[in-house]
Amino acid sequence: MKKKTTMGIVLAVLSVLVSCTEDDEYTQGQWIRRSDFDGVARCGASSFTMDGKGYLCCGYRGSNRDLLKDCWAYDIEGNYWTQCADLPDEAAGRHQAAAFALNGKGYVTTGAIKDEPDYLADTWEYDPASDIWTQKDDFAGGMRCGAIGFAVGGYGYVGTGFDDNYLKDFYRFDPNAAAGSQWQIVNGFEGGKRVYGLAFVIDDVAYVGFGENNNTYVEDFYSFDGTTWTRLRDIADTNDDEDYDDDYAIARSSTVAFVIDGKGYVATGDRNGVTSDYWMYDPEQDLWYGDADDDYTPLTSVHYSTGGSSRSQAVGFSTGTRGFVLTGQSGNSYFDDVYELLPYELEDD
């Protein structure tokens, strides 16, 4: 497991949507390249979004096997990057860490390192107003990497991952709780164990799934409103429901997600090799729309000379109305490119 470089908290995108039903309501979309990431190319970074800026922190630079602890802010309206304060000296560089934004602050927790004990449990809070990192309580679930992070209902949540075993536990983070009690266990998740899964949040409801368990892609999919976990349709053609497309093959690990106008987008990742396709989730229908329609535009078609944009371990930003994909890895290639999906625009001929 430690030799595996794929990772999942992050995001990337491609083929345009094919309906899993016969509905043709959704347009194909177009990818637009934005200002390249100003830091070094990397994979396995962590990201969160707040106040109109996307933040990218940490990650892995394969050329020198460097684990990074820098942090950068992308001004979404201005299309430019600004370097923020690095994680403090006492915080290790890391990759495969969980992250979320909450009440105007960003949080990075857990992750993988090169040396024993291999994994981390420390939690760091970033205040953009002061450009200062502050240590919070260690993650109560213990050291791990490849966990899922999200925020709903005024709390942060982190769960699943890998600590030499595959995990399925979740914990809630309360930034206002006294030191020593900021993390509390959350019960009720009946999904499978996994590492490199993901979550996206629509209308303060988290949608959780994807990842892998012992080299098998996990196919269950859940919503969580801060109180109740609800099982949704699997992300595979696992039953006789005719609303599923025969090619309903979304399950993967080390993928990324973002939200645009109440729809969830999942892109790239590792599915028996790196991928470049993307799928859109409609929570009102509990259905996915994906990459089987030739009318849709893969990110690959706008990629530069590296020969294609298939990748895993990327990250994504989302403002709720705009979604971005950046960085990642394919073989020995590490990316610093940034793309935005314009979901309602047709590709130019």
Task: Show where each model-derived region lies.
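Kelch-like beta-propeller repeat domains
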Residues: 20-349
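Sec-dependent bacterial lipoprotein signal peptides
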Residues: 1-19
